[in-house]
Amino acid sequence: MNMKTLRQDLPAGLVVFLVALPLCLGIAQASGLPPFVGLLTGVIGGLVVTSFSPSRFAVSGPAAGLVTIVVASIETLGTFSAFLFALVLAGIIQFILGMLRAGRFIALVPGSVIKGMLAAIGILLIMQQIPVALGASGDGELSGLFSGDFRFSTSSMLVAGAGLLILWLWTTPVIKNIKALSWIPGPLIAVLIGGLATVFGERLQPDFLASLPRITLPEFGSLSALAAELEGPDWQAWRNPSVYVVAITLALVASLETLLSQEALNKLRPQNPHPSPNREMLAQGIGNTLAGFLGALPITAVIVRSSVNVSVGAQSKVSILLHGVLLLICGLWFSDLLNVIPLASLAAVLLYTGYKLATPRLFIDQIRMGAQQFVPFITTIIGIIAFGMLAGIGLGIATQILYSIYKSHRNAMHLTRYDDHYVLRLQQNLTFMHNPRLQNLLDEIPENSVLIVDHDNVDYLDPDVKAVLKDFGEKAPRRGIRLNQWPVAVK
């Protein structure tokens, strides 16, 4: 660090803080937890994880992609404290995976499954935040829209609509071409407009805004008051078998999202040497273990904040550390200011985040890439929505493997006809799994023809494959079929 980089890191840290603040608050709210939990998660990610991370630019904190897992896990385990115990275990698992150098296995996860996972997270996030944006009361779930057990809040809808409009405007050339505005994050403006609507609306139309839910951050008069707000893990939860399923799910999905973010960030701003994925998993493991102890949300490296950090000119970790310090200061001494922010504004930010994860362009691109990409992609989405994150990812990977095996079998051998001559080209080593395809091709050879086998690219034939070829070779003379370059001996 020197004065030259500091001049770039300080404003970068401020911008990252402004982007992270509404996301930290919104993700906590979407998880059904107090907003302070989101700020605490951002502080741990910004200060602790950054200190151990090998990346100079990756920003860690609460991730929108884990919201659905957090909500489902708390519901499964019954209490937030039991979830925190699972989070401690998840952090330990991440640390062990880092020690075992498991980061390199990220390359084994198919791209179609990863994209499907992110799209499913986006869809679930949208489904979860629609009731909040509409000012849900009554059922409070999306299903309440169809059952009739749902009442709307006009003030919430107006605030959420204004937030979505601002977020859209901030992506248009009109705003991007205004340099002064292009540096201000759209989510921050959306939240500020919501806060101003609350402040001035209370004076002008108090009845209209009476039903507008807002953030409720506690005030901390002392460190003891802060400590009283922190919730610790329930160590008795070790008796619950579901805790270990949740811990493994959190560890795998958080690690996957972190390493994907790191790969994407390296394309935006290459580092030399390339940050070690194993060291990153160690850092994330430390952060998530501490988050579980202190009562925070799961932590991952997040591409949105990381890309902002790079785009505004960050040169070192100082910008990320500064954003963590600012989140801490904001949570400790400016809670009154944050308490004017309506939940509908945060819902707008999260709805837009969900849309970006599951944009229609992504579906169109996957369809254009063909069934081999689209089928595992859509299977992953359906699996995650219907059965949960781990089951959905497992289904997606299994579908990709089966489809790859199918295509490999189709491409392993080809039969070409030249008048009464047939050429059977074997393109790769064959196993017993290729027998049905081989038998079908051999059955296409008519009587009184010539069959030539091109097996120059084959080093190994399974004994079962040889048995099929030998059986055909012994019957061929009786059908008037002449064999050329036959790969097995016949009587």
Predicted regions and their residues:
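Membrane-embedded helical hairpins/re-entrant loop segments and their flanking transmembrane helices
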Residues: 2, 6-8, 19-56, 231-318
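Membrane-helix interface "capping/anchor" motifs
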Residues: 51-61, 173-180, 311-317, 360-368
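Hydrophobic transmembrane alpha-helical segments of multi-pass transport and channel proteins
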Residues: 54, 153, 251-256, 289, ...
